[in-house]
Amino acid sequence: MNQVSEGSRTVSVEEMPRVLQLRAANTNITEGESTSQSRNVRWEEDVVDNENMNKKKTKICCIFHPAQEEEDPEQLCPSDHEHSSSSSSSSSSESDDDDKYNSEQRRQRRIERRRRRQKTNRPASPNAYEIQPDYSEYRKRMNANV
């Protein structure tokens, strides 16, 4: 009897790792324009110069107000000042008066104050994010100090 033995064999194949190369879409580059110039970012006219720092952004993320040199740091710190119990401002005196009323009366007074405030015809002021601050005076002072 002939015995045929079947064996197994392992074949190892080394594959080179594949490299994916991305290319930009073909844009119409004129012959006079170099490739480095064609890849520069181009800002539209409505893009905001963020706080005169020549950092272009499409949206304003925060409102920056430069500190005034005339400001006294002691005036800016309210913790050093004592507050008297008899306030002359109308908002705090109204809230002091509210302590005399029950919750329904306070609610009615709040509604009435809101209606009075809404009746006053004042022009709609733009949101701080809707306008670009004017730093021309700030620039003049900074240039004068140089």
Curated annotation (Swiss-Prot):
This is Type 1 phosphatases regulator YPI1. The gene is YPI1. GO terms for biological process: glycogen metabolic process; intracellular monoatomic ion homeostasis; mitotic spindle assembly checkpoint signaling; regulation of protein localization to nucleus. Residues 23-146 are annotated as: Disordered. One of its GO terms (cellular component) is protein phosphatase type 1 complex. Residues 24-40 have a biased composition (Polar residues). Regulator of type 1 phosphatases which maintains protein phosphatase activity under strict control. It holds the Pfam family PPI_Ypi1. Its main location: nucleus. Residues 107-120 have a biased composition (Basic residues). It is found in: Nucleus. InterPro entries: PPI_Ypi1 (IPR011107). Keywords: Nucleus. Belongs to the YPI1 family. PANTHER family: E3 UBIQUITIN-PROTEIN LIGASE PPP1R11 (PTHR20835:SF0), E3 UBIQUITIN-PROTEIN LIGASE PPP1R11-RELATED (PTHR20835). GO terms for molecular function: protein phosphatase 1 binding; protein phosphatase activator activity; protein serine/threonine phosphatase inhibitor activity.
